[in-house]
Amino acid sequence: MRNLPKILTLLIVLVFISCIKPVKIIIPENMQNIPAMPVVGTENSWRLDFGGFHAYNIKDSDSRILLTDARNASYDIKSFEFMMSTAGGTQYECYCEFPMKSIDDETFRCMFQNVYNKFDVGKLTDRKLSSSSGEITIEGYFEFEGKKSDSKNVLVGYMYKDSDKLIGLVDVSNTNNETVWIDPSLDLHKQIMVAASSTSLILKHRKWYEGFYERLDQETEDTY
């Protein structure tokens, strides 16, 4: 019986999660004329597609090469990789790592390497996306329909800004039902960088929740 409080807490968490209604984000005004690109690909799929962008060979990795600082040493580090291609045939090898902290923790590292050009490398460092196209800032997005003015901020997406101009948005409010917006007036290389980063953030959220449920299952088993 000493484990009863822990079991009850886990049950309450599971009931709460199961009762959460799907969230519908509010599209920023200057994104409303940009075509929405729904993400096609289920939770455990090895492939994701949206618009003319395709992520495939998605798989977990055991490596730890991007997050080596001591402040993350006590956390379980999740790493994954995938290939990104476009309708034009450009291909990038993509690799990411993040610590299993809170879902809205900003610590995130990715590299996007052009298969055909070793000098074409994109780097995602927390909320900064750097490449030969320049630096893009990523900000958390918290606006959704029905949000109460006094409620705590809930992360529902990410905005991409180039010199304070909004150029992209990724909706991660509903796992396995994500959507991406990328300004089509951007040069192709910058679009690819935003697409690769968006794919990485989508996979991060999916894998965080996957790890979260695995921990719940393990803790439930340990109480018996």
Language-model segments: residues:
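C-terminal motif of bacterial Sec signal peptides marking the signal peptidase cleavage site
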Residues: 15-18
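Intrinsically disordered, low-complexity proline/glycine-rich segments
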Residues: 20-224
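Sec-dependent signal peptide recognition
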Residues: 3-10
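Residue-level signal for mature regions of secreted extracellular proteins and peptides
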Residues: 12-13, 103
